[in-house]
């Protein structure tokens, strides 16, 4: 394997100034997500979701909806992820849009989506 210690990217596209931030962080998040979609990034709605049940677990999931202050992703309640969230609902996540030199981090308590919303989503998925 080649030496990776020297790998480093200089980020120069745009600085983020605290004084320029909107009062509602969802305004900026939705703007950035829209720009990632318009830039045709691969899976711009993908984010790393971390759960913790005494030790951390992280995996990539897909954002499926935004209704501030809620971000929606779906999982099988019986999956490892679903079981971890049921036991300990605090989660953290990070969207990374490298080509745009942006990331968005968040943390909060995960809870099940309303049944109707969940049923509608799962009914829309293709059968395999």
Predicted features and spans:
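Binding-site signature for planar aromatic cofactors or substrates
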Residues: 1-128
